[in-house]
Amino acid sequence: MNYLHKILTKKEASLRNFHLLGYQRHLNEIALLKLMKEVDFDVLRLADMMNTTEKAEPFFRRADMVTLNCDAVESFSEAFSTNPQINGLNRREICAYMKEIGLSENLKTFGVFNFNVYSESALNHQLIAQMLWYLIEGINIQRTHPKERSYDTFVVLIDNREFSFKRDTFSGLWYFAKGNDMKKWIPCSREDYENTKRGELNKRFLI
């Protein structure tokens, strides 16, 4: 078992939220993925993160700490990471996610791990530099966002139960609203709202 399994199974563990994003089933222990679901932590497949940031963005929006394993970035002519993978996020996708990480409202710590520092490929070093540039751009943009926000409210009725969604009028981002305390609202996507209208409520909203 790896370090993550040990953290999640320790009695002293006090993680309120944890998201494992971009996993590939054949590269992860089945027991770990099963454990993540048992403790109601979120897992998102690599396939769900490709081509668009919409499904993964809500997990970054209020993240306090984000760690990036460079194994999640695809390698081609020369290894980008110390454990290179042929499948992974491409260059444009990883830069888009770095910007989303920087846009987090609560980001305090960010770490990049397993970058192949011994790579002789100039493109690999350019990519890691651009990734950090997009991270900083996201942070700078977040600092310009207004402190006071207004929201549009959307109510969905399922089996006589009302579920409220909020849309930030400035950013266009969506939240599942639990009461009036904005800190308890759950970041979500427009797709979550559309699915709820069809009677498919994301189970993480009920935890």
Predicted regions and their residues:
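Conserved alpha-helical scaffold segments that buttress catalytic/binding sites
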Residues: 1-112, 116-207
